[in-house]
Design a protein with these regions (language model features):
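Single conserved hydrophobic/aromatic residue that forms the stacking wall/gate
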Residues: 1-11
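Acidic, glycine-enriched active-site microenvironments
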Residues: 8, 40, 205, 226-231, ...
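Active-site charged/polar residues at nucleotide-handling catalytic sites that mediate phosphoryl
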Residues: 12-13, 88, 388
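A short, GP-enriched loop/loop-strand-helix hinge that lies immediately N-terminal to
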Residues: 13-53, 68-74, 344, 415-424
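Short, ordered loop/turn segments at secondary-structure junctions
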Residues: 23, 44-49, 77, 97, ...
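Gly-rich Lys/Arg/Thr-decorated short loops/hinges at beta-loop-alpha junctions or inter-strand turns
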Residues: 37-44, 57-69, 96-102, 166-180, ...
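A conserved helix-loop-beta module that forms one wall/lid of the active-site cleft
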Residues: 44-105, 364-371, 425-432, 437-438
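Internal nucleotide-binding/catalytic subdomain
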Residues: 88-293
């Protein structure tokens, strides 16, 4: 168990110091307590760790160093929160400080949502202020893993999330290398990451989360520790990143370790989250900013499509190659439907959709059968799913009421083992698999 008393017991054995970067979020919260016991912390200092965890301190750091974040503001009571929300506009992501796995983070869409959040999900006060920032709805999110010795920085991996921003990084599938982003964007990401790490005086491992939209890279979070994707990146690269970082924290420089960088990846590696929803009845399997996954799997392939399909199969999801696809998407996603509908039509899928989405599909010139929503009578989409007449579900939604109204669709898909995605980027990835018609390649683990 990670606790200050347990760490103190370990220190009685007279080590040179303690490394707290390998226990996730929990040991980071012990940094100040350990420092007060005069226990040396190897690697990034407790003060810099606190800088990354304290939303208000980090916001000031961002402003001081001319870094770019989404429009945001701090609030320690309901009145302040509503004022900030009115200033930057909805939808917003509400982020408390010092939380594990995105706990109590939420996307809110109006004043009513915000007030309910502040009075139920998280008790905001002077000791527990929250950061409210503009939700970058259609942004592409990235995780960047790096090692720094306080002087030299090596970026070890840039992972592109498949689900768009707003889904917790632990729940989103991700690809290394990035699968559809330009070298120009990669360069912008590297510049931003190097700037953050050098100014924060990071020593050891660090995870930086960013988003890209409208030709702008935004800094979301910095985690001065080994993230949950370090084992995945190490496996993809064939490089023991944890071992190298431990030596750096123990005092070695990257130059002394002759660690100049990581090799180019000649294949695609996709990490997919494993969800526990089938163990919990009546839980809506929709993804959001609060982490819900309990594990992860890895797919490796010569193309992104191959790696993604392997990862889905490993996570227990079979992507149907033909059949009937049900589509119901929020208004902001309808602009992206053309590519998806074209792909499904070319693969011979029959299309069914609720009224609003069906109208958009018809306007594109495709055949589609309109189906009733659950509250509009029967037969409705739930009936078709239970009758095994649906093979693929694409369901995106926003707003508390809309999410609640469509929860039964996602739950039925899970119970009936129907392939279901709740993001438009997830739907695009599925269509990539369908259009490529990939024959799987196989390699010995020793050759990877």
């Amino acid at each position: 168990q990670a606790s200050s008393s347990a760490a103190s017991d370990v220190y009685k054995r007279q080590p040179e110091g303690l490394i707290i970067q390998y226990g996730g979020q929990t040991p980071l919260k012990l940094a100040s307590a350990l420092e007060s016991l005069n226990i040396p912390i190897l690697g990034t200092s407790p003060d810099q760790i606190d800088l990354s965890e304290d939303r208000e301190r980090f916001l000031n750091f961002v402003k001081k160093n001319n870094l770019t974040q989404p429009p945001n503001g701090m609030a320690s009571n309901e009145k302040q929160a509503l004022k900030v929300a009115n200033m930057i506009g909805y939808p917003l992501v509400v982020r408390p400080s010092y939380v594990l796995g995105g706990r109590a983070m939420e996307i809110v869409y109006d004043d009513k949502d915000l007030v309910k959040y502040l009075n139920t999900a998280f008790k905001v006060n002077d000791s527990n202020p929250v950061l409210l920032d503009r939700f970058l709805d259609i942004a592409i999110e990235f995780d960047v893993e790096a090692i720094s010795d306080g002087d030299k920085i090596v970026i070890c991996g840039i992972l592109q999330h498949i689900e768009q921003a707003g889904v917790h990084s632990g729940d989103s599938a991700c690809s290394i290398p990035p699968y559809d982003i330009s070298k120009t964007v990669i360069k912008k990401i590297k510049v931003e990451v190097n700037k953050v790490i050098s100014n924060m005086k990071i020593v050891g491992l660090v995870n930086v989360q960013l988003a890209y939209v409208n030709d702008q890279v935004y800094l979301l979070e910095v985690n001065p520790r080994a993230s949950r994707t370090i084992p995945f990146v190490s496996k993809a690269l064939g490089v023991p990143l944890a071992r190298i970082a431990a030596k750096v924290m123990a005092g070695k420089s990257l130059k002394e370790l002759n660690f100049k960088g990581v090799p180019d990846i000649k294949r695609f590696c996709v990490k997919e989250a494993v969800m526990p929803f089938n163990k919990f009845q009546n839980v809506d399997p929709i993804l959001g900013p609060e982490m819900r996954s309990t594990g992860e799997v890895m797919g490796i392939g010569n193309t992104f499509a191959e790696a993604f399909e392997k990862a889905e199969v490993a996570a227990g999801v079979e992507i149907p190659k033909t059949g009937c696809a049900f589509i119901s998407v929020r208004d902001t996603d309808k602009q992206f439907l053309s590519e998806i509908i074209t792909s499904l039509n070319q693969e011979g899928f029959k299309l069914i959709a609720t009224k609003g989405t069906a109208g958009v599909i018809k306007d594109m010139g495709f055949k589609v059968k309109q189906i009733k929503k659950v509250l509009e009578g029967r037969p409705n989409i739930i009936d078709l799913m239970k009758n095994k007449e649906v093979n693929l579900v694409i369901n995106t939604t926003e707003g508390r009421e809309s999410i609640k109204d469509s929860a039964s669709i996602r739950r039925t898909a899970l119970d009936q083992k129907i392939c279901c995605t709740t993001t438009i980027q997830g739907a695009k990835a599925i269509c990539e698999v369908l259009s490529k018609k990939v024959d799987w390649s196989y390699q010995k683990l020793q050759e990877i």
